Amino acid sequence: GSRVSPDGNFHYSVAMMSGELFEIDAVDLSVKRILSLDTNKHHRNAMHHSRVKPTWVTPSPSGKELYIAGNGSNKIFIVDVEEWKVKQTIETGEGPYNIAASSDGKYIIATLKNEGAVSVWSTDKGRQISKIKTSTNIPHGVVISPDNKYAFVSVEGVGGEAGKVDVI
Protein backbone atom coordinates (compact mmCIF):
# COMPACT_ATOMS: atom_id res chain seq x y z
CA GLY A 1 0.00 0.00 0.00
CA SER A 2 1.06 3.56 -0.56
CA ARG A 3 0.10 7.19 -0.05
CA VAL A 4 1.22 10.67 -1.07
CA SER A 5 2.56 13.13 1.52
CA PRO A 6 0.18 15.95 2.60
CA ASP A 7 2.26 18.51 0.66
CA GLY A 8 2.15 16.34 -2.48
CA ASN A 9 5.94 16.23 -2.85
CA PHE A 10 6.55 12.58 -1.99
CA HIS A 11 4.97 9.20 -2.53
CA TYR A 12 5.55 6.60 0.19
CA SER A 13 5.27 2.90 -0.55
CA VAL A 14 6.11 -0.33 1.27
CA ALA A 15 7.32 -3.66 -0.13
CA MET A 16 5.85 -6.59 1.76
CA MET A 17 8.41 -9.22 0.79
CA SER A 18 11.57 -7.17 1.34
CA GLY A 19 10.24 -5.22 4.35
CA GLU A 20 11.26 -1.86 2.93
CA LEU A 21 9.79 1.64 2.96
CA PHE A 22 10.38 3.82 -0.10
CA GLU A 23 10.25 7.60 -0.41
CA ILE A 24 9.68 8.55 -4.05
CA ASP A 25 9.84 12.06 -5.49
CA ALA A 26 6.30 12.76 -6.77
CA VAL A 27 7.56 14.94 -9.63
CA ASP A 28 10.48 13.04 -11.19
CA LEU A 29 9.54 9.62 -9.70
CA SER A 30 13.07 8.94 -8.46
CA VAL A 31 13.55 6.92 -5.29
CA LYS A 32 14.96 9.33 -2.70
CA ARG A 33 15.33 7.08 0.33
CA ILE A 34 14.83 3.46 1.33
CA LEU A 35 14.43 2.23 4.90
CA SER A 36 14.58 -1.43 5.89
CA LEU A 37 11.97 -2.01 8.58
CA ASP A 38 13.59 -5.34 9.52
CA THR A 39 17.05 -3.92 10.23
CA ASN A 40 16.45 -0.14 10.22
CA LYS A 41 19.42 0.39 7.89
CA HIS A 42 19.65 3.23 5.39
CA HIS A 43 20.47 1.04 2.41
CA ARG A 44 18.73 -1.60 0.40
CA ASN A 45 19.47 -5.15 1.48
CA ALA A 46 19.57 -8.18 -0.78
CA MET A 47 16.07 -9.49 -1.40
CA HIS A 48 14.83 -11.51 1.55
CA HIS A 49 11.52 -12.47 3.08
CA SER A 50 10.69 -9.86 5.65
CA ARG A 51 9.44 -10.82 9.09
CA VAL A 52 7.73 -7.41 9.29
CA LYS A 53 5.74 -7.84 6.04
CA PRO A 54 4.63 -4.19 5.78
CA THR A 55 1.34 -3.92 3.92
CA TRP A 56 0.36 -0.25 4.17
CA VAL A 57 1.86 3.17 4.84
CA THR A 58 0.06 6.44 5.50
CA PRO A 59 1.52 9.81 6.49
CA SER A 60 0.41 11.80 9.51
CA PRO A 61 -1.57 14.95 8.62
CA SER A 62 1.53 17.05 9.42
CA GLY A 63 3.68 14.87 7.15
CA LYS A 64 6.28 14.52 9.92
CA GLU A 65 5.54 10.85 10.62
CA LEU A 66 4.60 7.76 8.66
CA TYR A 67 2.42 5.00 10.08
CA ILE A 68 3.14 1.53 8.72
CA ALA A 69 1.13 -1.67 9.24
CA GLY A 70 3.54 -4.54 9.93
CA ASN A 71 1.34 -7.51 9.01
CA GLY A 72 3.96 -10.14 9.87
CA SER A 73 5.22 -8.50 13.05
CA ASN A 74 1.84 -7.54 14.56
CA LYS A 75 3.09 -3.99 15.03
CA ILE A 76 2.53 -0.49 13.76
CA PHE A 77 5.79 1.26 12.96
CA ILE A 78 6.01 5.03 13.36
CA VAL A 79 8.77 6.52 11.21
CA ASP A 80 10.19 10.00 11.73
CA VAL A 81 10.32 11.41 8.19
CA GLU A 82 13.10 13.93 8.85
CA GLU A 83 15.40 11.46 10.64
CA TRP A 84 14.26 8.57 8.41
CA LYS A 85 14.17 6.01 11.17
CA VAL A 86 11.65 4.07 13.22
CA LYS A 87 10.95 6.14 16.31
CA GLN A 88 8.26 3.96 17.88
CA THR A 89 6.46 0.65 17.47
CA ILE A 90 3.00 -0.18 18.75
CA GLU A 91 1.99 -3.76 19.49
CA THR A 92 -1.27 -4.60 17.72
CA GLY A 93 -3.55 -7.54 17.42
CA GLU A 94 -2.88 -10.17 14.76
CA GLY A 95 -2.27 -9.13 11.18
CA PRO A 96 -2.49 -5.32 10.94
CA TYR A 97 -3.15 -4.80 7.26
CA ASN A 98 -4.39 -1.34 6.36
CA ILE A 99 -4.01 1.87 8.33
CA ALA A 100 -5.53 5.37 8.37
CA ALA A 101 -4.82 8.52 10.37
CA SER A 102 -7.47 10.96 11.56
CA SER A 103 -7.29 14.42 9.98
CA ASP A 104 -6.48 15.98 13.36
CA GLY A 105 -3.60 13.53 13.86
CA LYS A 106 -4.93 12.27 17.20
CA TYR A 107 -5.83 8.71 16.17
CA ILE A 108 -4.80 5.89 13.89
CA ILE A 109 -7.03 2.99 12.91
CA ALA A 110 -5.77 -0.33 11.59
CA THR A 111 -7.61 -3.34 10.24
CA LEU A 112 -6.55 -6.56 11.96
CA LYS A 113 -6.96 -9.04 9.15
CA ASN A 114 -6.25 -12.15 11.25
CA GLU A 115 -8.65 -11.14 14.04
CA GLY A 116 -11.71 -9.92 12.15
CA ALA A 117 -11.45 -6.55 13.86
CA VAL A 118 -10.22 -2.97 13.67
CA SER A 119 -8.35 -1.17 16.43
CA VAL A 120 -8.07 2.52 17.27
CA TRP A 121 -4.94 3.98 18.91
CA SER A 122 -4.11 7.42 20.27
CA THR A 123 -1.05 8.81 18.51
CA ASP A 124 0.23 10.77 21.52
CA LYS A 125 0.55 7.76 23.83
CA GLY A 126 0.44 4.85 21.37
CA ARG A 127 -2.32 3.39 23.53
CA GLN A 128 -5.16 1.27 22.16
CA ILE A 129 -8.48 3.06 22.65
CA SER A 130 -10.81 0.45 21.21
CA LYS A 131 -11.00 -2.84 19.33
CA ILE A 132 -14.15 -3.43 17.28
CA LYS A 133 -15.19 -6.70 15.61
CA THR A 134 -16.09 -6.42 11.93
CA SER A 135 -19.17 -7.93 10.26
CA THR A 136 -17.07 -10.65 8.60
CA ASN A 137 -13.76 -12.21 9.58
CA ILE A 138 -11.62 -10.51 6.92
CA PRO A 139 -11.34 -6.72 7.27
CA HIS A 140 -9.28 -5.13 4.54
CA GLY A 141 -9.22 -1.37 3.90
CA VAL A 142 -10.01 1.56 6.17
CA VAL A 143 -10.54 5.28 5.63
CA ILE A 144 -11.61 7.95 8.12
CA SER A 145 -14.12 10.66 7.19
CA PRO A 146 -12.65 14.20 7.01
CA ASP A 147 -14.64 15.24 10.11
CA ASN A 148 -13.21 12.21 12.02
CA LYS A 149 -16.71 11.02 13.00
CA TYR A 150 -16.70 7.79 11.02
CA ALA A 151 -14.38 5.12 9.73
CA PHE A 152 -15.35 3.06 6.70
CA VAL A 153 -13.95 -0.47 6.70
CA SER A 154 -14.09 -2.72 3.66
CA VAL A 155 -14.53 -6.35 4.65
CA GLU A 156 -14.06 -9.28 2.31
CA GLY A 157 -16.77 -11.81 1.65
CA VAL A 158 -16.11 -15.49 2.30
CA GLY A 159 -16.86 -18.07 -0.39
CA GLY A 160 -19.81 -16.80 -2.45
CA GLU A 161 -20.69 -14.13 0.11
CA ALA A 162 -20.39 -10.53 -1.07
CA GLY A 163 -18.01 -8.12 0.62
CA LYS A 164 -19.36 -5.26 2.74
CA VAL A 165 -18.46 -1.87 4.11
CA ASP A 166 -18.72 -1.48 7.88
CA VAL A 167 -19.20 2.02 9.29
CA ILE A 168 -17.82 2.64 12.76
How does the language model describe each region?
Residues G1-I168:
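Predominantly soluble domains enriched in secretory-pathway, periplasmic, or organellar proteins
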